[in-house]
Amino acid sequence: MKTFSLLFRATLLAAAIAATATTPALAKDPNVLRLGIDPSYPPMDVKMPDGHVTGFDVDLADEICRRIAMHCEWVEMEFSGVIPALQARKIDAIVSSMAITEKRMQQIAFSTKLFQFKSRLIARTGTPLTVSAEGLRGKRIGVQSGTQFETYVQKNWQPGGAEVVAYQSQEGVFDDLIAGRLDAALLGSVEADNGFLKTPKGKGFGFIGGPLEMGDHGTGIGLRKEDVALKDKIDHAIAAMRADGTYQKIAAKYFDFDVYGS
């Protein structure tokens, strides 16, 4: 009886494993595009009180999904984890204001450009800072981990004595800047001007120095290199949105200037 019971259990286990391996219901829905996003970067990527995500990135992606006949499914995660998640096939694309850089292009592919902004340093108004390696010596500069801003500070200011302080979220950067644990923060000028600096928390802070050139190729949608067909569809959708004025209408909801750049 005991032998029979063990054999019976083994048979059931084998059947369960086989069913798990072959059940079509567990396969990804081909009509769903899972998009990785860090919704902590207004006005580009924002999580609303009711839990849904919105922002310029989100509106653009929703329109792209509509045009390629797919449904956007937003997957929230820290920015530093989006490329590993894409490579592990936990998501299908990255839509999170990701700059197209030479380093990232070695790892993943990108759509054609979505927009292009300059970057700037922000600090408490009246802070006597000079935006240079010498002027920032001994200063604590906050950046979001995994961004081009972190790379820029490490390359240009850290060798001169600036301290790079990286955070998992942009909110963490702002919180420590407000608390006085940072001397300044580096981020996109539009995200700063249209986001943090226009909030009650941003009162008393402003830009230090002029726009900085990061050396990127604008911002795009991150994709796996092998997903050539998907990239082609997305690129065509972006071009069509630019041509028929839809892109400009979406941008006008957030900005009063040309965000696409030259």
Q: PLM features: residue spans?
A:
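A ligand-binding cleft/hinge motif common to bilobed small-molecule-binding domains
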Residues: 81-84, 96-106, 154-156, 183-215
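Short loop->beta-strand "edge-of-pocket" segments that line small-molecule binding or catalytic clefts
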Residues: 33-37, 133-147
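Short helices/loops that flank or line small-molecule/ion binding pockets
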Residues: 63-67, 75-76, 80-93, 107-109, ...
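Flexible hinge/capping segments at coil-to-helix
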Residues: 27, 123-141
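Periplasmic-binding protein-like
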Residues: 39, 115-123, 197-236, 255-262
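Extracytoplasmic small-molecule ligand-binding "clamshell" domains
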Residues: 27-97, 106, 244, 253, ...
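Ligand-binding clefts/hinges and TM-proximal coupling segments of bilobed small-molecule sensing domains
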Residues: 71, 148-165, 204-206, 236-262
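Ligand-binding cleft/hinge of the Venus flytrap
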Residues: 47, 61-70, 133, 149-168, ...
